[in-house]
UniProtKB/Swiss-Prot annotation:
One of its GO terms (molecular function) is proton-transporting ATP synthase activity, rotational mechanism. The lineage of its organism: Bacteria, Pseudomonadati, Pseudomonadota, Gammaproteobacteria, Alteromonadales. The gene is atpF. It is a single-pass membrane protein. Belongs to the ATPase B chain family. The chain crosses the membrane at residues 7-29. This is ATP synthase subunit b. One of its GO terms (cellular component) is plasma membrane.
Length: 156
């Protein structure tokens, strides 16, 4: 095999091509590849941070939901206690009012009874006086006396 000028020219051309590529083509390609690798690494790191942030946010949301449920249950419990208290107060007030009304009714009945007794005593006294007057007007005869007493008893 003989080395001729064509082969030597091709070798020199290839060497110049390689030098040109190393000097002018290779650095921008490497920069582009490195930038792309950096973007991918940053994207993966961001995705990892986002996943952690999402996990933290979900944990926080779950905790807040639990706290909200506890708070809601406490509020409901307080409302139920207040409701029971209001009902008890209303019952006590109603019982007091009922007792007051009953006491007033009993007092009115007692007053009316006393008034009726007084009226009845007055009427009995009036009838007794009337009977005594009639007895005194008539002669003190036993038959007349019995007749007047029977009439008085019938009137009473």
């Amino acid at each position: 095999m003989s080395i001729n000028a064509t082969l030597l020219g091709q070798a020199i051309s290839f060497a110049l091509f390689v030098w040109f590529c190393i000097k002018f083509v290779w650095p921008p390609l490497m920069n582009a590849i490195e930038e792309r690798q950096k973007k991918i690494a940053d994207g993966l790191a961001d995705a990892g941070r986002a996943a952690k942030d999402l996990e933290l946010a979900q944990a926080k949301a779950t905790e807040q939901l639990k706290e909200a449920k506890v708070t809601a249950n406490e509020i409901i419990e307080q409302a139920n206690k207040r409701k029971a208290q209001i009902v008890e107060e209303a019952k006590a007030e109603a019982d007091a009012e009922r007792a007051k009304i009953i006491a007033q009714g009993k007092a009115e009945i007692e007053n009316e009874r006393s008034r009726v007794k007084d009226d009845l005593r007055k009427q009995v006294a009036a009838l007794a006086v009337l009977g005594a007057e009639r007895i005194l007007e008539r002669s003190i005869d036993q038959a007349a006396h019995s007749d007047i007493v029977d009439k008085l008893v019938a009137e009473i």
